[in-house]
């Protein structure tokens, strides 16, 4: 199981990303707008720098919902590969069966 601090750090990052999503999108639209003047774009870059770095969605990590494991996580289930195997072997995931050919 992952350390609680790492899991909480990711949760804080998710909350920050959600909080600043609209503001980030508006500022990035000005920065990427080719019709905006250089001054407007420069001011937008300064405002963009004032947003916390952890508000960027790219800094989030997908983790297993049960263990917090950061790697080997399946998006479809939100679980790590080890937990998927355990749960699938018990037959608790509908439609998932052990492969045989």
From Swiss-Prot:
Q: Which InterPro entries match?
A: Ribosomal_uS14, Ribosomal_uS14_bac/plastid
State if Ribosomal protein is listed as a keyword: yes
- Output the GO biological process annotations, alphabetical, semicolon-separated: translation
Q: Name one GO cellular component term.
A: small ribosomal subunit
MF term (GO), any? structural constituent of ribosome
Signal peptide bounds: none
The record's annotation in Pfam families points to: Ribosomal_S14
State the UniProt keywords alphabetically: Ribonucleoprotein, Ribosomal protein, RNA-binding, rRNA-binding
Q: How does it assemble?
A: Part of the 30S ribosomal subunit. Contacts proteins S3 and S10.
Its biological purpose is as follows:
Binds 16S rRNA, required for the assembly of 30S particles and may also be responsible for determining the conformation of the 16S rRNA at the A site.
Q: Which family does it belong to?
A: Belongs to the universal ribosomal protein uS14 family.
Q: What is this protein called?
A: Small ribosomal subunit protein uS14
- Please name the source species: Neisseria meningitidis serogroup B (strain ATCC BAA-335 / MC58)
Name of the gene encoding the protein in the UniProt record:
rpsN
């Amino acid at each position: 199981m992952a350390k609680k601090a790492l899991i909480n750090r990711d949760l804080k990052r998710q909350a920050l990303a959600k909080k600043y999503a609209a503001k980030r999108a508006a500022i990035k639209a000005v920065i990427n707008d080719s019709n905006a003047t250089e001054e407007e774009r420069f001011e937008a870059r300064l405002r963009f720098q004032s947003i916390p770095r952890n508000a960027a969605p790219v800094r989030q990590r997908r983790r297993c919902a049960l263990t917090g494991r950061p790697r080997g996580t399946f998006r479809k289930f939100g679980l790590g590969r080890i937990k998927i195997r355990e749960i699938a072997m018990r037959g608790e995931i509908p439609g998932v069966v052990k492969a045989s050919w």
